[in-house]
Amino acid sequence: MRDRASRPGREGARGCAIGRAARRFAAERRGTSGIEFALIAPILLLLLLGGTTVFTLVRDSRTAERATYTVSDLLSRSTTKPDLNASHALFLAITRHAAADVRFRVTSVKKVKDKMVIDWSRAQAPEAPLADLAPLSAKLPVVADGDSILLVETSLTSRPLFSYLGLTDQTFAYLSANRPRFVPALPAPD
């Protein structure tokens, strides 16, 4: 006589029906591309928006760096009083940012008796003229006694295209130090 567990009954038939339904479901291919698209599309969109945002931030950083070195080189070639308004306007034109997002300062520094001394410093609002060289001392190049250098400091605040991805405003700050090429020191601008 068979015992109860080995007898085919309702539980065995139900298990067999569930197995057949599971096999039919696994073999079914209709609608899978729609489900795959629904799962992958948000990820692709996030990658596209994130890539575009990161590219824009890197482009802004590189442009600000190039603009800083361009303005610094232009000022170092000057033989007369520099026009800082024109230099600031050139920086804004190269970076294509609003003046509110940009800080701009030009400082002439001389080395007198083994000490760096500020000759003059001018800045565009809201930046203030440089009063103390101590924060920049580690970034200054080696200068011969009696020589001068021209420091151009800029910073640019860039806003991400899609800030809801967790990125916040980025500030890119650059310092360029050049020796005046044709004169010992640039005269102070008006």
Q: Over which residues does each language-model region extend?
A:
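Short, conserved structural patches
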Residues: 2-4, 69, 73-190
